[in-house]
Regions:
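Catalytic-domain carbohydrate-binding cleft regions of carbohydrate-active enzymes
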Residues: 1-391, 397, 404, 413-417, ...
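Short, hydrophobic/aromatic-rich segments at coil-to-beta transitions
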Residues: 473-477, 543
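Short, Gly/Pro- and small/polar-rich lid/capping loops
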Residues: 462-474
């Protein structure tokens, strides 16, 4: 690297897969425009380089525009069209689970590697409604180097912490971060003499940092930067030999490679550090609740995906069922596509959600099919010869031992009672909760080790279960072996007594549901809620 100060200019065309338009419009118009508009610039400007994120969009290019896709691959080989962002979809990073974020990265970079022989090393989220504290930890564990956004300038809850620095995650792992690159929807008319750039370079001198990062491009419908912006950057590059500031037409993640490979440990240690979340005041608050059914189904997809994966791996390890990687991956990708930052937050037009909700249901069914097939294979290989009645296998898919109620449907019971016994012959608490002409539904308490299975024995009986229970419920009082909970006439929780701690009273005052003040938003009425109002204590229920 030279000793000159450097301006990394990154050309981009931000594309909202959905927003105030639907998926079909993106495929038929915006994906196509992104390809052909950039091809024109490549032909005319030899120094022009372009960065575009999201392997999902590349899959759409490959499927719907195969000839243009092949042409794009040649530009990727030349290093002029750059894949970036590492992910399958340019998604929200607060609502998805950590596993979903890891899968997003896995699918994204795996596709880039398979199709282009490339991998990006950045989380590239120009437009997203806040960034949780776990994100740098996840990115670091995914072997990524950097994070880029311009969104903090919109209204970060903590301001913009620095231009370029280190973002430390909850577990102490760090990535580099560029969080003040200016708006991606921007046409460059000046660089070396631009006050914004000069101020950033001067500020960065405090950290012995001789570089900065600047966006130029277009959004939110894809396409390409304005030609006059591309022409201006090329003219600025031509002045590099006579200037003390070097202008680079850069890929989105080049700056992170350069810092990581060329800085000494002492230089890296001098970079400013942000050790907190980076949440937004704008959009983020309402985006956590708007169109809540989609968030519920997304969570259910994540839960079913984890459960199906573990059951499938167990069955495969035991050699009793083949691991169906293709079906599981397809189901994951289908709903991760809807973790896009204008989809799952609930900020898109209504017709978008007809597709996303349908896709959630399809993925849930696929995961459920894999879970049922794997669990059935496991059940057929369990030892059940100790059972005197109907064997019931209970599977615990989480990482800790679990004691919880289980429901099961049994046929051929008629009007008889059912009693349930564990594999040691001990009767456990159970009851019949429903009867139909075809089945009897029972409920019992199962205790299963982490990621384990256990067989219970359901026996037809003339008498019901007589195992004692510590649970008692009255109109305003609930008690079990650990707690006594009392409600007041208003429905508030008046008292919680911990029986195991000498009847310690946990509450200092009754707990009631808080009511948040919401005056609406004229600009973004479907999702915007006031950040400062939501930080306040909610008003109590009227007495």
């Amino acid at each position: 690297m030279s000793n000159k100060k450097k301006i990394y200019t990154v050309a981009t065309a931000h594309l909202d897969t959905v927003w105030s338009w639907d998926f079909e419009t993106t495929v038929s118009k915006y994906i196509y425009n992104t390809l052909v508009d950039n091809f024109k610039l490549f032909k005319k400007y030899p120094t022009y380089t372009f960065s575009f994120e999201g392997s999902y969009r590349y899959e759409l290019m490959e499927e719907y525009y195969p000839e243009l896709f092949d042409k794009m691959k040649e530009y990727i080989k030349e290093g002029r069209w750059n894949v970036c962002g590492s992910s399958f979809e340019n998604g929200d990073v607060n609502i998805p689970s950590p596993e979903a974020l890891f899968r997003n990265i896995l699918f994204g970079n795996s596709y880039f590697d398979k199709k282009f022989g490339k991998r990006s090393v950045d989380i590239y989220l120009p437009d997203c409604f806040g960034f949780g504290w776990a994100l740098p930890s996840i990115a670091s564990h995914a072997n990524l180097l950097g994070f880029t956004t311009q969104k903090l300038a919109w209204g970060s809850a903590y301001g913009v912490p620095f231009d370029i620095g280190r973002w430390r995650g909850v577990d102490g792992n760090e990535i580099y971060a560029s969080v003040n690159p200016h708006d991606y929807y921007f046409t460059l008319k000046k660089l070396r003499d631009w006050d914004f750039v000069q101020n950033k370079l001067k500020e960065n001198e405090k950290y012995d940092l001789d570089m900065t990062y600047i966006f130029h491009g277009i959004g939110d419908r894809g396409g390409a930067p304005k030609e006059k912006s591309v022409k201006f950057v090329e003219e600025e590059i031509s002045k590099n030999n006579s200037s003390d500031i070097e202008v680079l037409a850069s890929s989105a993640d080049r700056i992170y490679h350069d810092i990581d490979e060329n800085f000494t440990p002492e230089q890296k240690a001098k970079l400013p550090v942000w050790n907190n979340e980076l949440v937004m005041k704008d959009h983020a608050v309402g985006g956590y609740t708007s169109r809540a059914v989609g968030k519920r189904w997304n969570r259910r997809c994540q839960e079913l995906a984890d459960i199906a994966e573990r059951a499938s791996v167990t069955a495969s390890y035991l050699g009793i069922k083949e691991y169906n990687k293709s079906a599981i991956d397809i189901a994951w990708k289908r709903f991760i596509a809807h973790q896009f930052h204008d989809d799952i937050p609930g900020t898109s037009c209504q017709r978008v959600y007809k597709r996303s909700w349908n896709d959630y249901a399809v993925s849930m069914n696929q995961f459920a099919n894999e879970l049922e097939a794997s669990a059935s294979a496991l059940a057929l290989n369990m030892k059940t010869d100790f059972c005197k009645g109907t064997p019931i296998m209970v599977y615990n898919p989480i990482e800790s031992q679990r004691q919880q109620t289980v429901t099961a449907r049994l046929s051929g019971i008629g009007n008889k009672n059912v009693r349930v016994f564990d594999d040691d012959g001990n009767e456990i608490k159970s009851q019949v909760i429903n009867r139909t002409n075809t089945y009897t539904e029972i409920l019992f308490i199962a205790d299963v080790k982490s990621l384990g299975t256990r067989i219970y024995d359901a026996r037809v009986s003339d008498i019901p279960c007589n195992a004692e229970s510590a649970v008692s419920i009255s109109k305003n009082r609930m008690e079990n072996q650990k707690y006594i909970v009392t409600l007041n006439p208003n429905g508030d929780i008046e008292s919680i007594i911990d029986k195991e701690q000498n009847n310690f009273q946990i509450l200092k005052e009754p707990v009631s549901l808080g009511l948040l003040k919401y005056n609406g938003s004229r600009v973004w009425p479907a999702w915007e809620m006031n950040y400062n109002e939501n930080k306040k204590c909610g008003r109590q229920n009227p007495r």
